[in-house]
Every structure is written in C-alpha cells, then in structure tokens.
Amino acid sequence: MPSVRTKNLLHFHFIVFLFSFTSILGALIQLSAIPLVAHRMLWATGFIGIYILIRRPGDFFISKENIQWLMAGGIFIAFHWMSFFYAVKVAGVSLTLSMLSMGAFFTALLEPLFFERKIILYELVFGALAILGLVLIFQSEWDQLWGMLVALVSTILGVFFTLVNGKLATRVPAAAVSFYELGFGACITWGVVLFNPRMLDQALHLVSQDVMLLGILSLVCTAYAFVGSVHVMKILSPYSVMITINMEPVYGIVLSVLIFGEKELLNISFYLGVMIILAAVLGNGYFKIRSDAKQSS
C-alpha cells in the first residue's frame, strides 16, 4: 500500500505533466504574453469560484492574516506567468523550460530562511544536478541572453510563490488559496491590459481557436492543476515540489517534438540530461522517505 507521501508525489507528477502543456499552449495561442495570462487567470478564477460555490461555500471566508499571504502569492504568480509566457514568445519553449531547473537550487537556499530550518546538503546537491541535467539537454541553445534573463526572473518569482504556498497549504483550503491567488493575479494582469490600448484590443478580440485553447489552459492546466499543487503541499515541502517540477521540461520537450517536429531536437545529451534529472528527483524522494521513516520510528 503506497504511503501518503508516495500518493501525493504520484499525484504531483501527473500535475507536472499537465503543467508541461502550458508552454505548448502558450506557443500556439496567438495572444501576446500579458493578455494571455490575464485571460488564463480570470477564467481559472471563475472555474474555481464555481466549484467552491457548489461544493464548499464556506471556503470563501478567509482571515485578514491569510489574505495578506494570498495577495503576495497572487502578485508572485501574476508576474511569474507574465514573464514565463513572454520568455516563451521571445526565446522559445525549450530555453524557457530549461531555466526552470534553477528553481530547486534557489529553493534549497531560500526555504531554510523562510521556514527557519537548517540548509540540507543533499537538497543543494540534487538542485545542482538538476541544473546540470538541463544544461546538457539545451547545451546548444544558451546564446539568447535576453530570453534567459527573463526566464530566470520568472523562475525566481516561481520560487517565492511556492514558498508562500508552503505557508498557506496547512492554513487555508487548497481551492480557496487558488481562488484568491488567481483572483488577485487577474486584477494585476487586467490592470496592465486596461492601460495598454494594443493589449486591450488584442484581449477583447479572440479568435475561435484561442478561445478553445484558453479553455483547456484555464480549466485543466490551471484550475485543476493549481488546486492540486496546493493540496499536495500539505505533505510535500516547497523543495520537493520544485525538484519534481524539473520533470516539466522533460515532458514539455517530448510533447514539443510531437507537436512542433524539427523545432525541438532530441540527441544523446538530451537522454543523459534526463537521466541526471531523474536521478535528482528520485534521490530526493528516497531521502525524504527515509527521513520520514526515521521520524516515525
């Protein structure tokens, strides 16, 4: 019988697979980065709001202290996604996904400060291994400095967002966390759109294909995946979440090969990089399970 941690890890791997579709959908949707994120966050907020209204209306009521954390999470996720999709537009799917690998290393450094615990050496080692794996996968694509910088900023924002959710996961129901963070983020992104006539015109004139793709992105890859990712953080640490997210580029590259053909090439370095990332992800899981076993014995 799988342990609670194992079940949550497997569930999160499925969520990461769904996350890997976001870069593909972002490349297919004709909207520019900020209008795309504005629609994504607004639609997902609506979907989650309907779910809460039907299933658990009481989840709408949140304490003032938690509202402040939710606002911070909304700010981080809004700017994380805007910079992420902008990086996809200017630098491509592969380079943007590759920069996500640095998230685990940054989390290994920042989580101890955020949660007032000691730095764990193996987390730094596995975080560095994940970076090495992605460098091998994309060794021929590191000449786009601007795209790299934007993607790096997006990664750091994503780390802070994950740390905030680590605080909220045990305090607030997952659906409520998702509803308020996405809602605050939607206010920020639509505020930017409303003050830019070109973006506003683009956001208000969607083609039918974009409506369909936005529906998939918002309902499946955002509303469901977002709530699920917050829920698993009741058990998984922010670091475990970030190290597992390193599988997103692997899933994303395989999908992009199938969808975009020759735009994304697989070679020996790709497979070697994948093996290193897998070793880091599995190694972290092993040490976390062993640590849990020691604490319970």
Question: Locations of the language-model features?
Answer:
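Hydrophobic transmembrane alpha-helices of multi-pass small-molecule transport proteins
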Residues: 48, 71, 119-138, 189, ...
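Hydrophobic alpha-helical transmembrane segments of multi-pass integral membrane proteins
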Residues: 7-14, 35-51, 68, 123-128, ...
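Specific transmembrane alpha-helical segments of multi-pass solute transporters/efflux pumps
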Residues: 55-94, 100, 136, 218-236
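Glycine-/small-residue-enriched transmembrane alpha-helix faces in small-molecule transporters
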Residues: 1-38, 44, 75, 79, ...
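C-terminal transmembrane-helix exit sites in multi-pass transporters
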Residues: 50-52, 103-125, 250-270
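Helix-helix packing/entry segments at the starts of transmembrane helices
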Residues: 96-102, 165-186, 222-258
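Transmembrane alpha-helices of multi-pass small-molecule transport proteins
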Residues: 31-79, 106-107, 157-164, 179-197, ...
